[in-house]
């Protein structure tokens, strides 16, 4: 039996998520260049993102249900080990098929954040939960801030170098979790062996929306993620077409975005949440996000990107953890893993749809179209959340 630790479980999960996202941030911006190295084009590079999201859509609910049955720690360790193997395969890949297999494996075992959010729900009280979710968001932002810069620097020595280092980082995370990370879900709170329905993404997505206390909040989260999901892949094209930015400028800008995410979710959110509450932050954050996305669509000078996207980081940084915590409050302890797994599947669904919407609107309508679309979707998410939070009591559901 492992000795109980005197450190906060939140610190452990923060380190786990940060190290995981550090490796992710090192590799993902370089994927188009891995494809180019094998004579692939933009279509193949875009297909990689869709494949990753599709694999997460299939595996997300199963990972959540398995963590409810067997505990968060073993599931998290298996996911991290799968990530390490995927990065190793990517570094060694000598064909497009090998690259696709690596991304497929990474997507299937990409339940790290799903399990991390369930872990947070296990170790925090209802009042502390949104701050715990915000801490995960801060680790996410910090990893994505440092990862792309480190990956870009190392890629000067060859594209495979960042992939191999990301593999080593993921393996170190496995060792950290094996010897240091405590289990968060006691045996008495675990569920029975999951039925086939619990491992089926489509069935679990339908089950996810069935409980009335969380249905409309989940619709709001889905709409919010749909507003965002296509913009990450579209922004470099937008900034190049409108402002003439190159890859270096985009890299600096994404580091700035990561810094904003860390400051908002790691510092500001923890201070402001007890003062304003999750409901106000969810609604207010969605309003700021809708305004910021409209600002991106209207901008004609590149310096405006920094304050406007900073506003978007503020809006998303307070609304996403608040909505996640509000949904989590309405689900009992035995259903947290299924909730987070279903939520990850929901996110993956938007990651399949969103990039296509952004790409088509960008090419057919104009450079600002994806951001107008995102602004409208954020406004719809705001309206749905406002109505749901005004009328729904916090009644717990088993999911």
Q: Which positions does each model-derived feature cover?
A:
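Short amphipathic helix-loop junctions that connect adjacent transmembrane helices
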Residues: 29-43, 233-249
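C-terminal transmembrane helical hairpin of 12-TM major facilitator-type secondary transporters
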Residues: 279-323
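Helix-breaking motifs and short loop linkers at transmembrane-helix boundaries and internal kinks
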Residues: 39, 71, 92-97, 244, ...
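Helix-to-loop junctions at the C-terminal end of transmembrane segments
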Residues: 60-71, 264-278, 362
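Conserved MFS/SLC helix-loop-helix module at the cytosolic interface between two early adjacent transmembrane helices
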Residues: 57-96
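Juxtamembrane intracellular "pre-TM" segments in multi-pass secondary transporters
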Residues: 2-7, 182-219
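Cytoplasmic helix-loop-helix junction between adjacent transmembrane helices
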Residues: 102-141
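Helix-loop-helix hairpin linking two adjacent transmembrane segments in secondary transporters
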Residues: 136-179
